[in-house]
Amino acid sequence: MPNYYSTSDLNLASAIIVSWYQLSHIQKDKGKGLFFFEPSHKLAKFTEDYFLWRIRLDPMEYSGSIKTLKNYLYNTP
């Protein structure tokens, strides 16, 4: 299994997805998720920019992504 970038931060995972990075898989544990993405230099830069408040996202896409991930976490076995 390759090394992945992972985060348990739902908001960060949603921002990454909205920015067209491919979600590899999700590990669920008691309603919480660990989100895995293929690593890349662009993703590392995006994550840094996210925490420095440097990114711009479409608010509707972002909130939709959060909703979709929450539904997956809470409504799938």
What is the predicted role of each segment?
Residues 2-32:
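N-terminal acidic leader/helix
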Residues 30-32, 36-38, 42-46:
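Acidic, low-complexity, intrinsically disordered interaction modules
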Residues 11, 25-27, 40-43, 52:
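Alpha-helical interaction segments
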Residues 5, 44-77:
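C-terminal basic regulatory modules in eukaryotic proteins
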Residues 20-21, 38, 49-52:
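Surface-exposed beta-strand edges and their flanking turn/coil or helix-capping segments
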